[in-house]
Every structure is written in C-alpha cells, then in structure tokens.
C-alpha cells in the first residue's frame, strides 16, 4: 500500500527491512518455529500435511478421481476443508481442475486491479487504494495457500478465498468483493447518478 500511495523508496525499504528483521528474530528465538522452517527446507516429507497434499495431487493426475472420489480427505490430509482445499481439488478434479481454479482467480484479480486503475484515472485515490489493497490481499492469500498445497511454502494456516470452509473467511471475502464492486460502480457513474442509488 505504501508503494501504491507513492511513498519514497528509501522509506519503503526501511519498513520492509525492519519487517524482515523482526520476522527473522521471531523465527530464531523460538525453537518450534525454527524447527518447522528447517525441517520443511531440509525434507518436505517430514511435514505431514504437505506430504499428504502432494500425494493427493499426484493421485489425481490430469483428470482427477472424480468429485467425491478422493481418499486423502478421509483422515489422511489434515484440514482438507480449509488450508488444504486446493490439494483436494487437485485429487478429485486433477490438474485441469486446478488450472481452472487458477484461471478463475487470475480473471478476478485482473478485473480487480483494472477497477483500481480506473478509479485512479477518475481521481478517486482513496477508492483506488482500497481496491488495490483488496486485490493484493487476495493475491497474497491465494499465492501462500497454493504454495502450501504444492509444497513450495511451509503450512501456515491461510485459507483459499471463496473456496475454503470457514465463516469468517467467506464473510470477509464476500464483503471485500462487495467493496470492490462498489468502487467499480462509483467509478463508472457520475455523482448525480450515484445520488439516485442512495
């Protein structure tokens, strides 16, 4: 958000460096955190959740086992309805199903960033920053969740927006998309027409 708002690169560099330093200190001072990171980096098979997710995705192949045909979700894969929903999709719908999900997210994010760009062109800086923040949050959460499921990142408990089970996750995702649609509506209509909606 600081980068989009036009902050100086030195200020942004200081904030990012301080954040990375604090995270690094937190990891080094707690043996549990350090073990989780080092065990993941040395051998992903030691992380049960990641290993079971990869087994499920490999079992799915190109076309999957069919809806309801996956077996990893039955006590083998921890939290299949929340953190590891992408692995369940990979097992039951295959690589093609995972690609469909990725393309759907790419379409939503592309539209969202376009809404932010249009709002900025119309002179609505605050609305543009809000839209950009929502899209960036979605993109980061999607990236981390899919990275966890594919074994590229250690498990962290991030849900997959609009797909993972969980009341607060779904509610916040829907509210965020509603705000995004409101920004789009305000950017496309004049002030007089906006007053008619109220």
Residue ranges and their predicted role:
Residues 1-32, 114-123, 180-194:
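Alpha-helical transmembrane bundle and helix-membrane interface signal
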Residues 23-27, 134-144:
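Alpha-helical transmembrane segments of multi-pass membrane proteins
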Residues 42, 58, 62, 90, ...:
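Signal for well-folded cores of large energy- and translation-related assemblies
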Residues 30, 34, 106-113, 136, ...:
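Alpha-helical transmembrane segments of polytopic integral membrane proteins
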Residues 141-198:
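A juxtamembrane structural motif centered on a specific transmembrane helix
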Residues 10-100, 125-127:
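Hydrophobic, glycine- and aromatic-enriched re-entrant/interface helices and adjoining loop segments
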Residues 96-140:
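Hydrophobic transmembrane alpha-helices and their immediate junctions
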